[in-house]
Amino acid sequence: MAIKKKRAGKAKTTKGYFSKYPKISYEGPKSKNPWAFKWYNPEEVIEGKTMAEHLRFSVVYWHTFRATGADQFGMGTMLRPWDDGSDSIANAQKRMRVAFEFMEKLGNPFWAFHDRDIAPEGKTLKETNKNLDAVLKVAKEEMDRTGIQLLWTTCNLFGNPRFMHGAATSCNADVFAFAADKVKKGLETALKLNAGGFTFWGGREGYTTLLNTDMKRELEHLGRFFKMAVAYKKEIGFDGQFYIEPKPKEPTKHQYDSDAAACLNFLRQFGLLKDFKLNLETNHAILAGHTMHHEMETAAAAGALGSLDANTGDPMLGWDTDQFPSSLYETANIMYTLLKYGGFTKGGVNFDAHVRRESFTPEDLFFAHIGGMDVFARGLKVAAAMRKDKALSEFIKKRYASWDSGIGAEIEKGKVGFKELEAYMLKKGNPAANESGRQEYLENIINDYIM
């Protein structure tokens, strides 16, 4: 899905809520303008592609336009003058137009949403779908007007009390059926809006206690659910990418999609690896006890590195803080790994992050995204420079040189077994001496490029 050029057209917003703010543009590293990019130059070419093509930035609807700042200890704080707080269709449609006004100013080429982010739930499934269609009409108009595309969409299968025991893994078969209808509608929505993908996140697919759980049966139901989704995707001709997004916990104590390895194991078990890739999130990796680098390498080794949810977490806290990324060391490693494995096809850098409760003004939405886009752009430049100089790859190549010839090559080709290896070592006597892993030396190299 190539990035579309912006189209001329007048927004239908009744009041320009962002008209007093400038369109965000690139001014370079020396700029002190908080309303400008210092590193993200969408037209700059790196490794044969523009920054915009490499990064494929996406704004999420849920955190950016639905987060109120409320938490378990206090009410909402966000100032959103365009939102009257009602669940009316008129308010939902207005909110959608305002969202595209914001994205036009920011300059991101993609966006993403859950079904319930954009339209309220009705009293019946029929009414719910009607509400969604009414807002999708506005979304389609705005996408056509601006050229902003849908990176991926998804369904909220965790918020309503009906999903307390799960959706596809619920002990209630009717809830499974209800979830299936939601995903059916979601896939039809993805097709209608030409989405690049569709994401499954199992926030309630797991357990709180094993005392009341038939794990084997639940996993089999989840596998069957995904096979139904694959079948319907083919039936309607949707050619977007399916993603699973790993997360170990929150809201459920243990989620079945706990990390990249667990997701890959599940996909292999049910013969679905060819149909899915992973949408990896930094904060979820942290909660799973991993780095994002680890999760990306795990997915990429299986050919399943699909898309990225860009955020970060607070290592001092044990929950999903969904902060905007700000660490150059982190983004440099992320972009190095992404470039190493060929970059995105239909995925992108999706800002699944929200401003802090204390950052409550509309201006903060801009500052957060500008910072996130800049730190990823600079991470891309650092990664490309390291690749050009082969700063890490040459060291790794030499480190594994014993596998390129001799007994190492014989092992990799499957030409020897235990008996042959025993004979080899009896003749040689002792293994060749090990060499230093040089971790500190390599960390210094990365810091040299960053600084």
Where are these regions (language model features)?
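N-terminal basic, low-complexity leaders that serve as flexible interaction/assembly modules and, when applicable
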Residues: 2-82, 445
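Active-site beta-loop-alpha junctions enriched in small/polar residues
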Residues: 62-64, 115-118, 155-158, 203-205, ...
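Catalytic domains of carbohydrate-active enzymes, especially glycoside hydrolases
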Residues: 50-57, 87-117
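Flexible, acidic glycine-rich loops studded with aromatic residues
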Residues: 303, 322-451
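Non-cysteine beta-strand/loop elements that form the S-adenosyl-L-methionine
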Residues: 58-62, 150-156, 199-201, 302-313, ...
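N-terminal small/glycine-rich loop or linker at the start of catalytic domains
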Residues: 53-85, 155-170, 202-209
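Gly/Pro-rich active-site loop or hairpin
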Residues: 69-94, 213-219, 253-264, 286-374
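Active-site acidic/histidine proton-transfer and metal-coordination neighborhood
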Residues: 10-13, 43-46, 94-101, 109-110, ...
